[in-house]
A protein has these predicted regions:
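Short, internal strand/loop/helix patches
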Residues: 111-160
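Thiol-based oxidoreductase modules, predominantly thioredoxin-like and allied folds used
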Residues: 91-108, 124-135
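Amphipathic alpha-helical repeat scaffolds
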Residues: 46, 66-70
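N-terminal "domain-start" segment that seeds a small globular fold
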Residues: 23-55, 140
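Thiol-/selenol-based redox modules, centered on thioredoxin-like
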Residues: 140-143, 147-194
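Bacterial Sec-dependent N-terminal signal peptides
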Residues: 1-26
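Conserved helix-turn-beta segment immediately C-terminal to the redox Cys motif
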Residues: 60-62, 70, 74-98, 117-121
Length: 194
């Protein structure tokens, strides 16, 4: 009798374990469900105060760059505008975010920034409202760009003005490019064309 009870208990245990194992294989992990978000959830203000909805960029490759008017890297505006003009009709867009986080190199108002960009570099790519890209007052979009728990790819820190974030056609972060890397770098151009 004890042997039969043992066999029945063993069979029930094995069946229960098999069902639990199968359920855990088919059930996505919490990190996967909560993990990777996309850029399309964000709405921000542009330099004119109008709403800019990132969902309007679905299907395009996006370069997000934090900018400054009084930085040694400010001449990158010229290259940014050049690649924007060359590839904007081929599914690519640049979105600039002025930020005053590094040595107070973007002290101007939105209007002053807009005038500076147009007069000095002929900027036509979308430029957003001045935000913070670091610290306690970091904008939500930059939390997405810099936190693996939100972007599902990597943690990063904005090192300086003109750091670039490459977003694929699905709205997912794919690469972070250092500030000193020029927008015309072969790796970036290859990614745009790919």
């Amino acid at each position: 009798m004890n042997r039969i009870a043992f066999l029945v208990c063993s069979a029930v245990f094995l069946i229960t374990a098999q069902i639990q194992a199968q359920t855990s294989i088919n059930k996505p992990k919490t990190a996967q469900v909560m993990g990777k978000q996309t850029i399309y959830q964000f709405k921000v203000q542009d330099l004119s105060g109008d709403t800019f909805d990132f969902s309007s960029l679905k299907g395009k490759k996006i370069m997000i760059v934090n900018t400054a008017s009084k930085c040694g890297l400010t001449p990158q505006y010229k290259d940014l505008e050049a690649i924007y003009k060359e590839y904007k009709d081929k599914g690519f867009v640049i979105v600039g975010f002025p930020a005053n986080n590094f040595a107070s190199q973007e002290p101007g108002t939105n209007k002053e920034i807009e005038t500076f960009c147009q007069q000095n570099y002929g900027v036509t790519f979308p430029m957003m409202d001045k935000i913070s890209v670091k610290g306690d007052d970091m904008a939500e979009i930059y939390k997405f760009l810099t936190q693996k728990s939100k972007n599902g790819v990597q943690d990063s820190e904005v090192e300086w003005n003109f750091q670039k974030y490459l977003i694929n056609e699905k709205g997912e972060l794919v690469k972070v490019i250092k500030p000193r890397t020029l927008p015309t770098d072969p790796e970036i151009i290859s990614w745009i064309k790919g």
